Design a protein with these regions (language model features):
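Beta1/beta-strand and adjacent pyrophosphate-binding region of the FAD-binding site
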Residues: 3-17, 168-173
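Beta1-alpha1 glycine-rich phosphate/pyrophosphate-binding loop at the start
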Residues: 4-5, 14-92, 180-209, 278-279
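Conserved hydrophobic helix-helix packing surfaces used for dimerization/oligomerization
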Residues: 9-11, 32, 170, 193, ...
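A Rossmann-like FAD-binding core segment of flavoenzymes
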Residues: 91, 95-129, 188-280, 332
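Predominantly flavin-linked oxidoreductase catalytic cores and closely associated redox partners
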Residues: 120-195, 200-210
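Short, well-ordered coil/turn residues at beta-beta hairpins
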Residues: 135-136, 173, 259-260, 300-303
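FAD-site-proximal beta/loop scaffold in flavoenzymes
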Residues: 150-164, 262-311
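A conserved FAD-binding loop/helix module that cradles the flavin
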Residues: 301-332
Length: 332
């Protein structure tokens, strides 16, 4: 944690990758501060309430602490409990509900300008650090619909739980795990579900236990499927689809869950001098050290993958901090 003065490392983001980086800083004797705009591991807090991870518990572990769960795979709740215990065990003292509003590059270090996310709480003073690690994830940057009606209150880019939708007609847009799992949960809670996906088939990355379930529900028409179709307009009580033949269909609808994935905060990265390249918009970093082209600036976690968010998970992002800290120590 911070000891005052200029930090060795400022870590922006209090998710698993950020916490793992902080632990590595601690082990290397580097002064550090974790700065998180929300609560601890806020991205996991935002997951659907009943979500089960795709992976086994040991692949979510950081700092050598075991994650104990009651089933083969951990739940969202178990992960939240685990990461709280990690923060306590290592005395990480993250600065929570504090947003990094801007980063200035000085001759020898960085100045981070902070803004409180808590109403009525004054903004803290700036933080200076020789190195900055952006472990910021992408959950604040959902891929949004660009059609008439997308601004209506009935449209959401995040699914939390089934209860508010009971007895309603809900359109779930997307073909990945988030969309498929939301559609299944809603169906089992008494919701009339329509699943819409522009692809002719669902994602090849579906969890192995989700694929047969969603495919069977679609085959039995228990969930109405519109594959190879796109939404053209959203209205208060319906939406218009265009199928692969070009035909248009009006579908009665109460709520829309557009679960279309996420993207990195490109504007923020560009403001710091971080370029992105390729069709997947991957930020330019050294693949071994995760250093950007800006001296002293590193990326960690999901933001490294660009738009290919399925390529970096907690399972591999948790090791980024080790490589980053090794490079910082080698170049001091």
């Amino acid at each position: 944690m911070s000891t005052g003065g200029v930090l060795d490392v400022a870590i922006v983001g209090g998710g698993p990758s950020g916490l793992a980086t902080a632990i590595e800083c601690q082990r290397a004797g580097l002064s550090y501060q974790v700065i998180e705009k929300g609560g601890l591991v806020d991205s996991i807090r935002r997951f659907p309430v009943n979500m089960i991870f795709f992976t086994t518990p040991e692949l979510l572990e950081i700092g050598g602490m075991p994650l104990v769960c009651h089933r083969e795979k951990p739940s969202r709740y178990e992960a939240l409990v685990y990461y709280r215990k990690v923060a306590q065990r290592y005395d990480l003292h993250p600065r929570l509900f504090t947003r990094v509003a801007g980063v200035e590059r000085n001759s020898d270090d960085f100045t981070l300008h902070l803004k409180s996310e808590r109403e009525g709480i004054p903004d803290p003073g700036p933080v200076r650090a020789r190195n900055v690690v952006l472990a910021i994830g992408y959950y604040e940057n959902p891929n949004r619909l660009d059609v008439p009606g997308a601004e209506l209150d009935k449209v959401s880019y995040r699914y939390v739980e089934t209860h508010p939708y009971f007895g309603s007609k809900v359109a779930v847009i997307g073909g990945g795990n988030s969309a498929a799992e939301a559609a299944l949960e809603l169906f089992r809670a008494g919701v009339e579900v329509t699943l819409i996906h522009r692809g002719e088939t669902l994602s090849s990355h579906l969890k192995y236990w989700v694929r047969p379930d969603i495919e069977n529900r679609l085959a039995r028409r228990e969930i109405t499927g519109w594959l190879g179709s796109v939404v053209e307009e959203i209205r208060m009580d319906s939406l218009t689809l265009r199928d692969s033949s070009g035909a248009r269909h009006e579908v009665p609808n109460d709520f829309v869950l557009a679960l279309l994935g996420y993207r990195p905060p490109y504007r923020f990265l560009e403001s710091l001098g971080v370029r992105s390249e390729g069709a997947d918009g991957r930020p330019v970093t050294d693949p071994e050290t995760f250093a950007t082209e800006v001296p002293g600036l590193y990326l960690a976690g999901g933001v490294v993958a660009g738009r290919r968010t399925h390529m970096v998970f907690i399972e591999n992002g948790r090791f980024h901090g080790e490589a980053i800290v090794r490079h910082i120590c080698a170049t001091r």
